[in-house]
């Protein structure tokens, strides 16, 4: 904690695979900038002190169990235990306040250390290489994780990758192309505008608990250094290796050797991966004519029968224009901002002030601001509802000109009926999830037993809903053997999750997996029904 320690730096091949030589030099300069900082030792010391205080305050289950045990020995002990507990709780309250102060200062120091390390890198390579790398790394991380997730889902088929890093590169470039991200130096040139394309929020809350500054803050600091340069280097960093592909294959084997396969493994060639990736994207996306309008929005609930009486002229390009898509994400951002402000008001987030649309507000102003935002949100939603009405009328007019027997009204009504049923299923998931939150907390034994008795009725409804999902023809290809087996075990009887003094972990895991799979399947079921409607509409064009 105080004496010097050996400084090790691990560089991931996935990182090397996503940057140029100059960008890698900037990243390494940033890391070595940390090594040169005297504040690193102070930060390490504060971190360890902080960790000790945290364990004293929050990781003390054995102490709580000891107190409960002493209180249960005899009634004569109860009074003394209660008095002692009140004194200890007061001391803990003081320590918690001290912990908050130490932690906030440590986090602030940590953020400053990041800025200083960025400045070190900028002095060595100029700012631009580090800016480009920082902006691209989230795409690189997403691409690498997606490739790994693909094989996690393919475990029953015993597929393994020959070279997961080539798959990472393919996904990264493919995503850049479909999102119209330009290329520079053979790599996607990601910008802040592209990252925040769908973020229309005007709310800015400085997170005093964050250990790293935000990406936007880091880039603004780097740009202010006035040493940005042209992107002269176009050489991929992985060319620094004598045989990068051999290294990638060796590391890929090490990654997949950790997995136990039931049968003989099958190496999945890159061409097959590319084909399956594109098929999966197509399966889980809506037709391109919608321009992303429905990606995070569902058609508004309408009485479409009345809308058949008036048919107007509209253009597809207007109904799904970039302006209409922006309107969708503006409404979503308003809704998120309102929810965040309400959490601040409820003291979920501890802040004294915040910025909204360039103006500083205090916590006491939240209710007034929320009321204004709700009016604005209602206005945006009305605009979107009107656009949905126009969309329906547009496709209805096309259908009437092409088909003798129109079906669009039936498709919409079926979708709206299903939506109402799906909302009930989702509510059931939320209800049970909230009801079992206590298993994550320290809870007295008698309260645990009482809480489990309260969820019996909810579980009964959940099991009914699971049976319906198992019989849904549209979901048969989505229900894996492992999921079906766990469902059937869960449905087989009424399970007990807690004994006298401990949880039955196997039973709990089974129930939590059933609940998680239920949520996945109702989401998938909703997507299937929504896509049926949208595909029918698109097919009319």
Residue ranges and their predicted role:
Residues 73-76, 80-99, 103-110, 128-541:
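Cytosolic-facing loops and C-terminal tails of multi-pass membrane proteins
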Residues 18, 39, 43-47, 101-123, ...:
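Active-site metal-coordination segments of metallo-dependent hydrolases
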Residues 1-44, 48:
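Peri-catalytic and regulatory segments of divalent metal-dependent proteins
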């Amino acid at each position: 904690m105080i004496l010097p320690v050996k400084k090790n730096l691990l560089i991931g091949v996935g990182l090397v695979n996503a940057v140029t030589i100059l960008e890698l030099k900037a990243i390494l300069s940033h890391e070595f900038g940390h090594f040169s900082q005297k504040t690193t030792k102070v930060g390490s010391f504060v971190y360890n002190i902080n960790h000790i205080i945290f364990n004293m305050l929050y990781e003390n289950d054995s102490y709580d169990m000891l107190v409960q045990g002493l209180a249960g020995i005899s009634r004569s002990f109860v009074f003394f235990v209660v008095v002692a507990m009140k004194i200890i709780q007061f001391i803990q309250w003081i320590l918690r306040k001290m912990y908050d102060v130490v932690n906030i200062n440590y986090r602030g120091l940590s953020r400053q250390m990041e800025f200083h390390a960025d400045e070190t890198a900028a002095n060595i390579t100029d700012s631009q290489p580090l800016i480009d790398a920082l902006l691209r790394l989230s795409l690189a991380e997403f691409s690498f994780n997606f490739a790994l997730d693909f094989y996690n889902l393919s475990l029953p088929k015993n597929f393994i990758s020959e070279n997961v890093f080539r798959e990472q590169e393919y996904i990264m470039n493919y995503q850049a192309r479909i999102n119209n991200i330009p290329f520079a130096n053979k790599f996607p040139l990601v910008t802040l505008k592209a990252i925040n394309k769908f973020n229309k929020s005007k709310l800015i809350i400085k997170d005093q608990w964050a250990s790293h500054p935000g990406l936007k803050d880091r880039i603004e600091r780097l740009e202010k250094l006035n040493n940005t340069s042209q992107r002269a280097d176009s050489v991929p960093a992985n060319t620094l290796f004598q045989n990068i592909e051999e290294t990638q294959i060796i590391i890929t084997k090490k990654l997949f050797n950790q997995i136990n396969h039931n049968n003989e493994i099958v190496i999945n060639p890159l061409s097959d991966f590319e084909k399956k990736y594109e098929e999966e994207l197509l399966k889980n996306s809506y037709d391109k004519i919608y321009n992303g309008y429905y990606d995070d929005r569902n058609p508004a609930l309408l009485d479409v029968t009345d809308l058949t009486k008036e048919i107007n002229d509209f253009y597809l390009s207007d109904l799904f224009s970039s302006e209409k898509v922006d309107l969708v994400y503006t409404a979503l951002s308003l809704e998120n901002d309102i929810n965040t402000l309400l959490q601040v008001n409820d003291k979920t987030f501890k802040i004294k002030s915040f910025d909204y649309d360039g103006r500083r507000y205090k916590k006491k102003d939240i209710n007034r601001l929320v009321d204004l935002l709700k009016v604005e949100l209602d206005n945006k939603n009305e605009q979107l509802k009107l656009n949905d009405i126009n969309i329906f009328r547009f496709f209805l007019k096309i259908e009437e000109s092409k088909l003798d027997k129109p079906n669009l009204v039936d498709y919409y009504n079926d979708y709206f009926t299903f939506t109402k049923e799906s909302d009930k299923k989702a509510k059931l998931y939320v209800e049970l999830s909230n009801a079992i939150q206590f298993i994550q907390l320290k809870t007295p034994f008698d309260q645990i037993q009482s809480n489990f008795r309260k969820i019996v009725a909810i579980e009964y409804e959940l099991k009914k809903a699971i049976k319906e999902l198992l019989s849904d023809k549209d979901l048969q290809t989505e229900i894996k053997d492992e999921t079906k087996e766990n469902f059937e075990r869960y449905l087989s009887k009424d399970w007990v999750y807690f004994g006298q003094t401990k949880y039955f972990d196997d039973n709990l895991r089974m129930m939590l997996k059933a609940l998680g799979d239920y949520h996945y399947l109702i989401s998938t079921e909703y997507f299937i029904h929504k896509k049926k409607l949208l595909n029918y509409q698109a097919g009319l064009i």
